[in-house]
Amino acid sequence: MKRHLFLITFLIQTSVFAQVTVSYQLIQTYSVENINSLITEMGLPSGIIVPEYGVDFYRVLYTTEYKDSLVVVSGAMVVPKNMTCPAPLTSYMHGTTSKKLNVPSYNSSEKDICILFASEGNVVLAPDHVGLGASTINLHPYMHGWTEAHAAINLMRAAREIIPEDENIDVELSDQIFLFGYSQGGTTTCHTAKVIEELYSDEFTVTAIAPLSGAYNLSGAQTDFINSGQPYATPGYLPYIIMGYQSIYPELYENLSDIFIEPYASMFPNLFYGHNYNMGYINNQC
């Protein structure tokens, strides 16, 4: 019944202002005992995470900006159960992945991070991003800050739409917002904070961010190293960036052979567009 009311509310309110939620689904419930077992399996030191709450794990489909249109993407929403005080909204940005379903709302280790943080009393959100997860876009625009930031921001909007309307979600959101991420997620964390500050400060007030091990100076330190002639341990990241940016800015080049020599120009479409290979495999092919 509540789901029907949510859909009716959604249809009414779309005539007033744009909603971003398309649908959402409860994937799994984890008890405190389940989460403690997960901590043991992960080999985490005692006391790093102390679960206080069981959690419900949802997959959310929502709309986000991609180039000059809106597209449907997916993300995880993990909600603590039986909280007696308001919970902060905490957005986790995942690390680099090239496999379509190696993302938080599906079966990846990134999902476990969301579960652990939610068990300590956070509503944890984790965007899968354009081109990954449920997205039908054939390539993730890797490291494109505007696109990645909006995937995170729109998932926060979706959570604010869903949580007050679903009687099965017994948590109230506080005014606190935390952003954190690792690797690509560290960079996305910075982009998200910047976009919120510049464009959406009337809608969101970020309490704190924790960007970890991100690429923060692509046009400086990264470019200098690439041009230095030194061996690069993860060469697959370079075509991922170039091809991802070309998907946003098609004028960058017409053909991969304009940028890459053979056999790489012929190899990269299969490696990246198919979403079948992880970055370890792609790095080995480069």
PLM features per residue range, with description:
Residues 202-213:
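A conserved short beta-strand
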Residues 79-86, 158-180, 199-204:
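Gly/Ser-rich "nucleophile elbow"/oxyanion-hole loop immediately N-terminal to the catalytic nucleophile
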